[in-house]
């Protein structure tokens, strides 16, 4: 109802829709996307329509990344984040967590068919909450390949201080 009254002429009504094509191909961080979070945001916005590879340039990336479900992913349309050089020592993704709600550097909360390869991931927290990777939310087929993981330095056997924390079942983790 325009202006709170019945529409006298429905023939002139319009609707606008913006459609985004799914991502496919190889992209560079930070050339095409400044951060891993920026790449994740575009994945969530556009989805994928083929294999997507993000080559991460040598450097340190201080950020925390949460991957929800992404439209279009499958065994034939996967997502890979990898060191551009192929050298694990060249890329460091780090974050300092501060509580149970953010106890991760990389989190998969519904993401499927996603791989991290040849990178270092470190939680720089110095107290209790030090998970590095958290997998949950019905995430499936998550692969961590040739990665170096380091949790916080606090000595505990707590649930909140694991290099890889998996919640739920049947994740297809490798």
Residue ranges and their predicted role:
Residues 1-22:
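Extracellular/luminal regions of secreted and cell-surface proteins that mediate adhesion/ECM remodeling
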Residues 23-62, 66:
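Acidic Gly/Asp/Thr-rich repetitive segments characteristic of extracellular carbohydrate-active
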Residues 29, 45, 63, 67, ...:
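Extracellular beta-strand solenoids
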Residues 49-52, 77, 117, 140:
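Loop/turn elements at helix/coil->beta-strand transitions in domains of secreted/extracellular proteins
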Residues 56, 81, 114-116, 139-144, ...:
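All-beta strand scaffolds that present successive hydrophobic residues in beta-strands
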Residues 64, 72-128, 151-159:
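Right-handed parallel beta-helix/beta-spiral solenoid domain characteristic of secreted/periplasmic
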Residues 151-174:
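Solenoidal tandem-repeat scaffolds enriched in leucines and small polar residues
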């Amino acid at each position: 109802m325009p202006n709170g009254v019945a529409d006298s002429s429905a023939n002139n009504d319009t609707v606008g829709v913006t459609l985004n094509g799914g991502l496919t191909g190889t992209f560079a961080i930070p050339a095409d996307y400044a951060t891993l979070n920026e790449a994740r945001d575009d994945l969530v916005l556009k989805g994928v329509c083929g294999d997507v590879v993000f080559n991460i340039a040598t450097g340190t990336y201080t950020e925390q990344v949460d991957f929800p479900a992404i439209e279009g992913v499958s065994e034939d349309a996967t997502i890979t984040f990898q060191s551009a050089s192929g050298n694990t020592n060249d890329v460091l993704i780090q974050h300092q967590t501060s509580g149970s709600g953010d106890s991760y550097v990389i989190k998969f909360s519904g993401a499927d068919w996603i791989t991290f390869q040849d990178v270092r991931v470190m939680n720089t927290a110095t107290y209790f909450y030090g998970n590095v990777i958290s997998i949950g939310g019905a995430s499936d087929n998550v692969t961590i390949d040739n990665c170096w993981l380091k949790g916080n330095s606090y000595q505990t056997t707590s649930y909140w201080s694991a290099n890889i924390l998996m919640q739920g079942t049947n994740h297809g983790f490798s």
